[in-house]
Amino acid sequence: FDRSATGYMSRCFIQQDLSAVTAACLMMKKSVFEQVNGLDEENFKVAFNDVDLCMKIRKAGYLIVWTPYAEAYHYESISRGTEDTPEKQARFKGEAEAFMIKWEKELELGDPYYNQNLTLEREDFSIN
């Protein structure tokens, strides 16, 4: 987010629990990382590894807390590039399918931190 972005209901300015955060800026106790067996490098070599990690952490009973007090600059996909070749697209598709299968039950329940009255079809937080 841009530093001046307020987000929905000014949520960019408050600490809050989320289902997942990006591994580009992520911190946890080593013991928690080890307890959930870290990143799944076998099934999620590039995509979804951070979300999978967060899902495992939540399943173990911990919270994923986002804070506005940490700031980092992250240029998504600069080092790895985009999914612009058939091989990369196939890898991404495989990782997406593996994620959907692994977390099917949790995904069907919906995001506990997203208001179920708001649409998932657009990013404007309009009423469903």
Question: Positions of the model-derived regions?
Answer:
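C-terminal, non-catalytic tails of nucleotide-sugar-dependent glycosyltransferases
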Residues: F1-L18, T22, M27, I64, ...
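A short, conserved alpha-helix in the catalytic core of glycosyltransferases
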Residues: F13-N37, E42-Y73
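Conserved active-site-proximal loop/helix segments of enzymes involved in bacterial cell-wall
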Residues: Y75-I78
